[in-house]
Amino acid sequence: MGLAIPVDRQLVHNRKIQCQGFIRADGNFDIEAELIDSKTYDFPSDTHGVVKSDSPYHHMKIRLTVDLNLTVLDAAAVTLTGPYHICPKGAGNITNLIGLKIGPGWKRRVQTAIGGPTGCTHLTELTGPMATTAYQTIGGEISRQQRAATASDNLPDTHQNDSLKNTCIAYAQTEI
């Protein structure tokens, strides 16, 4: 069951974010994210004339290559569509993420590395869901490989992972 609709309403804005995780032939992982913003109506743009209904006015992509330790080995980004002519330049500092490790403090380090007046707010924001996608991709792949190696369908007890302790209700440590 979904959310109840509280009142009559009309959709005016769509933001689509898709993240995907890939294992590479070299054993590293590519984490890719895409953001697309569109409106449900035509609107004027100083730099693009009229932006048509359902046409993207933000469309960005990022790829981070990470190792098993979640260290960024390579980074690439592109702004395919932005509201201003300068927007594509905001992807230019994405390589500042190389060498950073996904983990506690990731958002702060990303903001320092690629945010602010030389970066792009939307690309910076995309790195948050990319981090959780990296965790899901790598953790799932490690478990899958362990099951294949032992020919077992038993899932490992993820509650044993200390890095997840108290990160959400499922991993809350109860007092005895």
Residues covered by each model-derived region:
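Active-site- and interface-proximal helix/loop "cap" or "latch" segments in soluble metabolic
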Residues: N14, G21-I23, L35-I176
